Amino acid sequence: MILATARVLQNVIETRVGDELWTCRPVGGAANPIARKIEELFSTVYRTYRPSAPDEIHSTVSYHPKNDEIIVQVGEEKWRTKSSVFGPLTLVYGGIQYTINEKLTGRFAMLRGGKVIATGEVGFRTCKIKEYPAELEMILADLALGYLIRTLFWEMLR
């Protein structure tokens, strides 16, 4: 199971991937500590750190509200979701196209060739993905973070 949880007062997102607990921190570039904290509060770009290498960035996940897309970057590789106004999100990963059908209840399903391969649910401060193939665990963990960033962004504007 993958469980991403926003710790709003600490300004971090913790993502449990199997037995590992990833720490996801917002990106802030200002030199002034107060300006950096304010910048981090409104950031839609997060870096993930794994416990096996706590000082090394595992991935960078960002949400871009203008195009309603989530971008995941691991090293030199980059994947992005494509959004359409009335259709599902799409993602090409490993040369295979996946579609993500979302419901207003926060539940979603990831499909490959019309067959459901992963299911999950997004709340205000959590994103849980229960069933999924093992080979998709890393990208799904980053997508869970992206969904949570998107939810936090839109809740902030409410």
Where are these regions (language model features)?
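Helix-adjacent hinge/juxtasegments
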Residues: 56-89
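A general, composition-driven signal for non-globular sequence regions
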Residues: 1-4, 31, 50-57, 71-78, ...
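Low-complexity or membrane-interfacial segments used for flexible interactions
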Residues: 1-44, 67, 85-158
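Acidic, aromatic-enriched beta-alpha/helix-loop junctions
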Residues: 38-58, 62
